Amino acid sequence: VHLTADEKAAVTALWGKVDVEDVGGEALGRLLVVYPWTQRFFDSFGDLSTPAAVMGNAKVKAHGKKVLNAFSEGMAHLDNLKGTFAKLSELHCDKLHVDPENFRLLGNVLVCVLAHHFGKEFTPQVQAAYQKVVAGVATALAHKYH
């Protein structure tokens, strides 16, 4: 991902304030509610029948935290996202058969959740930098599909 020094500083500073459990659970939950076809990858998670069920689901929250912990690894290695996400790309491609478009959708949902959590602190400049990061992560996760 090609970030300016200011962009890198902005995303890193904000990421240091992120509660991965809270934001991760909300981001994955919103993905499953807003794009319900993504639920097919989580049929072992139990009740996903209503938005309230999804947002209150302990397995969704736990997996959302796991997703954001992996994203944190990417934030620590912004210059090597393909390497950082190589094993996860392989897992999602070869074993889980996840549509790589879902990575882009989740990235966009994550940006919405960050805006919701950080309000005025999530300026248009910070959003632009995060859009670059989530696009880079989505590309890295889709790498094994090509």
Curated annotation (Swiss-Prot):
One Pfam family cited in the UniProt record for this chain: Globin
GO molecular function, a single term: organic acid binding
Domain of life of the native organism: Eukaryota
Keywords of this entry: Acetylation, Heme, Iron, Metal-binding, Oxygen transport, Phosphoprotein, S-nitrosylation, Transport
One GO location term (cellular component): hemoglobin complex
SUPFAM superfamilies the record matches: Globin-like
Modified residues (Phosphoserine): 44
Binding site for heme b: 63, 92
Disulphide linkage map: none
Modified residues (Phosphothreonine): 12
Modified residues (N-acetylvaline): 1
Tissue: Red blood cells.
Gene Ontology BP, a term: hydrogen peroxide catabolic process
Keyword Nucleotide-binding among UniProt keywords: no
PTM annotation (N6-acetyllysine): residues: 59, 82, 144
Subunit annotation: Heterotetramer of two alpha chains and two beta chains.
Function per UniProt: Involved in oxygen transport from the lung to the various peripheral tissues.
Family according to the record: Belongs to the globin family.
Protein name: Hemoglobin subunit beta
